[in-house]
């Protein structure tokens, strides 16, 4: 088996899958009393280090955030919302799902704090910057035109129809605004999180 693995030059993840299959087979053989012990129990592969996530330099982020607003009024409205998303991702390090699920009641503008329910349904308090506050306030001035009145339980980031933005929509808007700014980086929310 070792010779076959070496000949095929399998990747680390392929080797892990192969070892997992062997372990399962050996466990089945042991449970069926075909083997007295599982010879694969003590065998472990060396873990390969994961590559670090990409980074974006500050000048590139500033180029995106400081780009002029579009000329069309409907595009200007989208830009206000998108800029609030970008500023929030950049200044707080939130995950995409956390931005997506953010509600109006979760924002404390006076203390520049967000109440975030993250992975494992755990709640934490996250600070955000004054530029993100200003962008959020600019967006929320426009918000009633899209959603109607302010409801504390309403999502902060919504579509023109007043529905909460989905993860894919947020990803697409982040990419779109990077392209509009003339940035060649494949920008996505998780990359902004790592710039925090």
Where are these regions (language model features)?
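Conserved catalytic core of the tyrosine transesterase superfamily
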Residues: 1-196
